[in-house]
């Protein structure tokens, strides 16, 4: 679980306007922060399949949100993936 201070910083950095917590950009950024925090755990605990299922669920949800954002506003999608470094 990410700390509330880190979560607040992620929301502040990706909010479209003050108080924005539900936009796709914020949701994707929060999921990315949680995914990045979990990755070292799976490097050391390779057989944690139950936890991996939760990780894959988060990755899938992030992918769906990104697909939604891409269909609604491609410019915001491109800016977000560049900001978060999701595509190479």
Swiss-Prot record:
Q: Which domain of life is it from?
A: Bacteria
Q: Does the keyword Ribosomal protein apply?
A: yes
Entry keyword set: Ribonucleoprotein, Ribosomal protein, RNA-binding, rRNA-binding
Q: Which Pfam families does the record associate with it?
A: Ribosomal_S15
**InterPro entries per the UniProt record, alphabetical:** Ribosomal_uS15, Ribosomal_uS15_bac-type, uS15_NS1_RNA-bd_sf
Which GO cellular component terms, listed alphabetically, does the Swiss-Prot or TrEMBL entry include?
cytosolic small ribosomal subunit
Q: Name one GO molecular function term.
A: structural constituent of ribosome
Statement: the UniProt record of this protein carries the keyword Ribonucleoprotein:
yes
Which GO terms of type biological process are on file?
translation
Instruction: Read off the SUPFAM superfamilies from this record.
Output: S15/NS1 RNA-binding domain (SSF47060)
Q: What is the stated purpose of this protein? A: One of the primary rRNA binding proteins, it binds directly to 16S rRNA where it helps nucleate assembly of the platform of the 30S subunit by binding and bridging several RNA helices of the 16S rRNA.
The subunit field of the Swiss-Prot or TrEMBL record says: Part of the 30S ribosomal subunit. Forms a bridge to the 50S subunit in the 70S ribosome, contacting the 23S rRNA.
> What PANTHER family does its record include?
RIBOSOMAL PROTEIN S15, BACTERIAL AND ORGANELLAR, SMALL RIBOSOMAL SUBUNIT PROTEIN US15M
- Family under the similarity heading: Belongs to the universal ribosomal protein uS15 family.
Q: Can you say what this protein is called?
A: Small ribosomal subunit protein uS15
């Amino acid at each position: 679980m990410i700390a509330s201070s880190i979560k607040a910083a992620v929301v502040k950095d990706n909010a479209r306007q003050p108080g924005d917590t539900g936009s796709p950009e914020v949701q994707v950024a929060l999921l990315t922060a949680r995914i990045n925090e979990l990755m070292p755990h799976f490097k050391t605990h390779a057989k944690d399949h139950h936890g991996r299922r939760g990780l894959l669920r988060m990755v899938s949800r992030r992918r769906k949100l990104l697909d939604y954002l891409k269909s609604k506003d491609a410019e915001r999608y491109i800016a977000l993936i560049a900001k978060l470094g999701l595509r190479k």
